[in-house]
C-alpha cells in the first residue's frame, strides 16, 4: 500500500522545510520528498543573507516578517540552530541610484525596519579600508546579518518531524499524479505516494515537475558561484554584510578569517538542471579578485580557500511563484531566483495558510502568481536598482 499524507512537499531546501514546519505545527500529516539530501540544492549554496532591503514592498514585508525567526530561533522554532550572526547590512549604490535608495529606505522605515541612509564616510567606518569615493549612498541595517542556510533547513525539518512530519531523502519524484482534475499524489523512483495536496518546491527542477500536470512555468536554471577567501593578517575586524551594486558583487565576513564573495554578472542561465556543477573557472575567480580588490584593496594579498557553484530557478522578473495552479491540490513555490533564503520563514507561514485556510492572513502573497508572466505584469519595484539582487 502506498504511503500517504495530507500534504506532500517536493524538495527539502529551506523553503520546503519552512513549509513543513508551519504545516506540521497545525497538525497536518506532512511528507517531504527530496531527490538528494536536505539542503543539497540552492539552500546549501546560499550565502545566507538576513536583510530587509528590497525595492518591492511585498518582498520587503516577507523579509521583515521572517526576521524574528532568525533572531529568536530557539523561541520560535525550538529545534536545531539557524546560526544567525548579527553583523549589520549595507546596501551600496552609485550616485545615479542614490535617490532610489533613499526612497526605498523610507519605505522600509515605514514598515518598522531599523535602517538609515548613510554616506561614504560612514561606510568607511563600518568597513575598514574600503574605497568609498564611488558610493553615492548606502542603506544600513544594524540588526541584520547572515545565518547558516543548511542549519536553518535542518532546524525547520527537525521541528516538523518532532510534530509528526516524515522525510524521504534520495527520493526522486518523476511526476505528479492526477485523477480527473485533482491531484492524487506523486510517482517517484521509490514508488508512488498518495496525497490530495502536492507542493512543488523543487528549485531548479520545479518546472519539470509542473509540466507533468500540464503547467508551463517560465523557469530557467541559473548557476550562482561563490568563493571563500582568507583575509590577510591584520584584517580580521568585523564588518557588515555588503551588497555592492557599483561592482555587481556581494560579500560578507565568515568569522574573523574569511570573506565569502559572489558576483552578480557572468552566471550561466539556461540548460538542464541535471548538468554537473563543474568547478569555478579560473576567469571567474580572477574576476572575483579584481572586484573585491576594487572595494577592499587590502584583499590583494588574500588567498582563495574554497569555491563552489549552485543553482536555483530563475523567473523573468526574478521573483517567486507562490500559488495554487493547474489541477486542484497542486501548488507552486518556486522561482526564488537566488534570494529566497531570507524570506523562507514567512513564505512557509503564508503557504500553510493558503493551503489550509484558502487565504493568507500573515502577509499578502497574491501578486506572486504564474499568470503575471502571461499578462506581462512583472513584479518590479517602483524605484528599482536594475540588477539581480535588487
Positions of PLM-derived features:
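C-terminal catalytic lobe of FAD-dependent flavoproteins
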Residues: 290-390
Amino acid at each position: 500500500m502506498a504511503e500517504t499524507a495530507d500534504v506532500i512537499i517536493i524538495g527539502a531546501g529551506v523553503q520546503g522545510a519552512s513549509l513543513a514546519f508551519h504545516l506540521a505545527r497545525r497538525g497536518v500529516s506532512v511528507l517531504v520528498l527530496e531527490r538528494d539530501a536536505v539542503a543539497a540544492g540552492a539552500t546549501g549554496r546560499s550565502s545566507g543573507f538576513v536583510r530587509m532591503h528590497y525595492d518591492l514592498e511585498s518582498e520587503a514585508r516577507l523579509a521583515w516578517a521572517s526576521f524574528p525567526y532568525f533572531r529568536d530561533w530557539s523561541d520560535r522554532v525550538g529545534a536545531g540552530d539557524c546560526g544567525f550572526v548579527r553583523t549589520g547590512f549595507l546596501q551600496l549604490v552609485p550616485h545615479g541610484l542614490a535617490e532610489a535608495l533613499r526612497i526605498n529606505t523610507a519605505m522600509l522605515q515605514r514598515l518598522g525596519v531599523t535602517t538609515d541612509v548613510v554616506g561614504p564616510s560612514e561606510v568607511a567606518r563600518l568597513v575598514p579600508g574600503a574605497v568609498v569615493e564611488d558610493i553615492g549612498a548606502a542603506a544600513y541595517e544594524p540588526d541584520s546579518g547572515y545565518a547558516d542556510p543548511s542549519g536553518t533547513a535542518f532546524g525547520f525539518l527537525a521541528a516538523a518531524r518532532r510534530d509528526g512530519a516524515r522525510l524521504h531523502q534520495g527520493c526522486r519524484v518523476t511526476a505528479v499524479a492526477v485523477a480527473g482534475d485533482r491531484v492524487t499524489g506523486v510517482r517517484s523512483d521509490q514508488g508512488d505516494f498518495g496525497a490530495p495536496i502536492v507542493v512543488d518546491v523543487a528549485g531548479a527542477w520545479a518546472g519539470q515537475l509542473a509540466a507533468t500536470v500540464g503547467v508551463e512555468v517560465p523557469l530557467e536554471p541559473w548557476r550562482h558561484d561563490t568563493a571563500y577567501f582568507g583575509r590577510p593578517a591584520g584584517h580580521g575586524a568585523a564588518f557588515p554584510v555588503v551588497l555592492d551594486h557599483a561592482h555587481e558583487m556581494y560579500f560578507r565576513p565568515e568569522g574573523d578569517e574569511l570573506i565569502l564573495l559572489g558576483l552578480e554578472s557572468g552566471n550561466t542561465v539556461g540548460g538542464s538542471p541535471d548538468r554537473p556543477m563543474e568547478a569555478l573557472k579560473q576567469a571567474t575567480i580572477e574576476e572575483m579578485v579584481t572586484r573585491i580588490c576594487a572595494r577592499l584593496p587590502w584583499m590583494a594579498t588574500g588567498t582563495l580557500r574554497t569555491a563552489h557553484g549552485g543553482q536555483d530557478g530563475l523567473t523573468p522578473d526574478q521573483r517567486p511563484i507562490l500559488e495554487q495552479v493547474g489541477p486542484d491540490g497542486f501548488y507552486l513555490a518556486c522561482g526564488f531566483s537566488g534570494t529566497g533564503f531570507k524570506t523562507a520563514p514567512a513564505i512557509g507561514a503564508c503557504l500553510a495558510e493558503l493551503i489550509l485556510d484558502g487565504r493568507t492572513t500573515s502577509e499578502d502573497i497574491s501578486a506572486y502568481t504564474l499568470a503575471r508572466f502571461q499578462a506581462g505584469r512583472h513584479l518590479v519595484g517602483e524605484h528599482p536598482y536594475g540588477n539581480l539582487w535588487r
